[in-house]
A protein has these predicted regions:
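Extreme N-terminal starter segment of soluble prokaryotic enzymes
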Residues: 1-5
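Helix-adjacent hinge/juxtasegments
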Residues: 37, 41-77
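Unusually extended, aromatic-enriched hydrophobic runs near protein termini
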Residues: 7, 17-18, 73
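Glycine- and acidic-residue-enriched helix-capping/strand-helix junction motifs
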Residues: 16-30
Length: 77
């Protein structure tokens, strides 16, 4: 069993914490990454956390996860 969890983040999520914090909050994507990695470690999983502003790259990553039989979490934006 593959213990890798891909966490894929889509367009503009790199701006979390800076762009309209009154709407989206002050938590940055890096803070979310750190929390995700800590939780994965507690669960004996490997977190592969990524962000892209390009839909084609996201599709490539989804196919990569499929080829590796990895779990997948997607935050499209």
């Amino acid at each position: 069993m593959n213990r890798t969890v891909f966490i894929l983040n889509g367009p503009n999520l790199n701006l979390l914490g800076r762009r309209e914090p009154h709407i989206y909050g002050h938590t940055t994507l890096d803070q979310i990454r750190q929390r995700s990695e800590r939780l994965a470690e507690e669960l004996d999983l490997v977190c592969d956390f990524r962000q892209t502003n390009h839909e084609g790259v996201m599709v490539d990553w989804i196919q990569e996860a499929f080829e590796q039989w990895a779990s997948l979490i997607i935050n499209p934006a």
